[in-house]
Amino acid sequence: MVLPASMRLRGHRCFDHLHRRGKRYYGTWMVLRKAPSNAKLLRRDIHGLLTQTQPHSCRIAVVISGKVHKRAVVRNRLRRLLHDHLRLRFEARSTHSDVWLLISLRPGADADEANLLEECDRLLEEAGLQP
């Protein structure tokens, strides 16, 4: 299942915020960036209303470069795998953090799904986001 729209992080200003202000946690196959949320940076529609309904919740983006794998099918499968894993982790939590997360995969991250998910959990725990 895909990540719900209320949990997705979109827009170049949000990504710039994460790159400038985010704390980085490094793993073998991925980098996790965590920053406090900033509702002013979220996308708005033509009427000035937020396009996403919950401005104060955990929002997540997964970025997978073409260097990870040359085939888009493989990159999309990895993105869906991480989206589903993160959705299950954050929906199970009773309290929602007011943070934004950006997960960037490094080249070679398509090696083993189990190791990838294990590393994701380890980085979330290191960032203080694992229950």
Swiss-Prot record:
One of its GO terms (biological process) is tRNA 5'-leader removal. Its EC number is 3.1.26.5. Keywords: Endonuclease, Hydrolase, Nuclease, RNA-binding, tRNA processing. It comes from the Bacteria. One of its GO terms (molecular function) is 3'-tRNA processing endoribonuclease activity. GO terms for cellular component: ribonuclease P complex. It catalyses: Endonucleolytic cleavage of RNA, removing 5'-extranucleotides from tRNA precursor. Consists of a catalytic RNA component (M1 or rnpB) and a protein subunit. RNaseP catalyzes the removal of the 5'-leader sequence from pre-tRNA to produce the mature 5'-terminus. It can also cleave other RNA substrates such as 4.5S RNA. The protein component plays an auxiliary but essential role in vivo by binding to the 5'-leader sequence and broadening the substrate specificity of the ribozyme. Belongs to the RnpA family. This is Ribonuclease P protein component.
